[in-house]
Amino acid sequence: MISKNNIYNICFILIFILLAIINKVSSIPENTEWQANHSSDLRIISATVSEDRLMIGLNIRLHDGSYTYWKNPGDSGVEPSIQILPNPEIIQYNVQWPAPIIIKNQYGTNYAYKDDLVIPIELELTNKGNLLNLDLDVEYGVCREICIPVKDRIEFKIINDIENYISHSNKLLKSVLTDIPKYRLDDEKVIRTTKLLNVNGTNVLSIIFSEQVKGVIIDQSDNFQFFDTGNSLEYYEEYQFTFREIYNGREIKGEKVSALIFLENEYFLEDFIIE
């Protein structure tokens, strides 16, 4: 039989643990302070939970009409890098890039962001309940007439326990998650077929669509780099990319490629096999 004193002691310990957890969470600011850089500012947006995933956000605020680049900058520009320094309580993390805009000018075609940008980062933690002091290294370009590379480090805190964030909701971060390109639920395909061409000695991939599209970006290919050669039009029924091998001796026929497709009021990912 448990004595009253033991019950009081157990209750006291539980209350102490609860207060310690509350104190940990309350000691973490909702967002880090803005850090000033060339024509831009940086901060970390605090954690939120979406579909049982713990998310933070890298917030980049661009000044005076400047822009920065997507994970694939396109024909020119500065390829960004976002890295969380190793920590034994982080199993892995995944940077999730919102859909960019397509910029066509005298320098070619580039994929970029303007104004205020939030890049979600999904964290998988060990859930040990500890307060973590983390460092995020970021490199990106800030561009107008010329591009200036920026390199910075942001220090931030997080509780290593997803349950602490279940009831927490950062509206800005949650709204940005809807901007992450996804595959269509109806599984309808917009890419009808592909053709391989040789135009004046240059290898060209031609993509033919089943309906008019506003734009297309080659999102991922393991063995080839693709370069946009399309003119600036309102709609496209066919689009062409030049390409080159990343590894010598690869055959492009049968290569699986992921594309980001823009329609009038939506965008989505679609995989296809080069025929």
Q: What are these model-derived regions, one by one?
A:
Residues I2-C11:
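Bacterial N-terminal signal peptides that target proteins for export
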Residues C11-A20:
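Bacterial N-terminal signal peptides
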Residues I22-K24:
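N-terminal signal peptide c-region/cleavage motif recognized by signal peptidases
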Residues S26-E275:
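Extracellular/lumen-exposed scaffold segments
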